[in-house]
């Protein structure tokens, strides 16, 4: 429905607008699932579009009890040595890279699935992710939004949720130590 109504014309306009990448931002997993469903329908038409969903680090990590550090995590150790082969597969295979597909690829290449999703974001046409990846100062995708490297379209799902999310992101809380 609504996801397709925004994604399809935006994708169709890519060759004419010089837009390099589409960001589909949602506050909720359900909104991301809706975008993934719309992308599945688009991919079923054999269009050579690459897309991915960035899953939160806490949900994607293979070793959540370990620090994200090459000294503690085997998926971080040697990450950049194994990354090129994984990215080559993403470049060579149009379609949607969801959490499960990225995890499978990450396991095969023994790389961190979360970091792989961030690096793979440069290789795809559409990125489905949480609002935080654009608006939160601590999790913003700096490689896209602070380096000012390209022209992007941003589609915001359920925009009315952004107000509450923004208040949470930019509010401070002081707690008394006991």
Pin down the residues of each PLM region:
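Amphipathic alpha-helical interaction segments
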Residues: 14-17, 166
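Walker A/P-loop
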Residues: 1-8
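Hydrophobic residues on the short alpha-helix immediately C-terminal to a glycine-rich phosphate/catalytic loop
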Residues: 9-13, 38
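Signature of the SF2 helicase/ATPase Hel1-core->accessory helical subdomain module
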Residues: 6, 33, 37, 109-126, ...
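A substrate-engagement module of RecA-like helicase motors
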Residues: 17-127, 132-135
């Amino acid at each position: 429905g609504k996801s397709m109504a925004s994604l399809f014309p935006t994708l169709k306009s890519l060759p004419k607008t010089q837009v390099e990448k589409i960001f589909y931002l949602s506050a909720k997993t359900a909104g991301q699932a809706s975008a993934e469903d719309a992308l599945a329908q688009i991919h079923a038409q054999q269009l050579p579009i690459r897309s991915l969903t960035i899953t939160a680090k806490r949900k994607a990590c293979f070793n959540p009890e370990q620090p994200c550090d090459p000294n503690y995590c085997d998926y971080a150790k040697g990450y950049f040595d194994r990354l090129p082969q994984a990215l080559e597969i993403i470049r060579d295979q149009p379609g949607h890279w969801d959490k499960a597909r990225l995890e499978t690829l990450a396991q095969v290449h023994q790389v961190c699935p979360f970091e792989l999703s961030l690096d793979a974001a440069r290789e795809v046409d559409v990125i489905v992710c949480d609002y935080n990846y654009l608006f939160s100062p601590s999790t913003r995708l700096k490689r896209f939004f602070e380096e000012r490297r390209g022209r992007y379209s941003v589609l915001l799902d359920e925009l009315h949720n952004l107000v509450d999310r923004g208040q949470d992101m930019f509010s401070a809380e002081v707690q008394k130590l006991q």
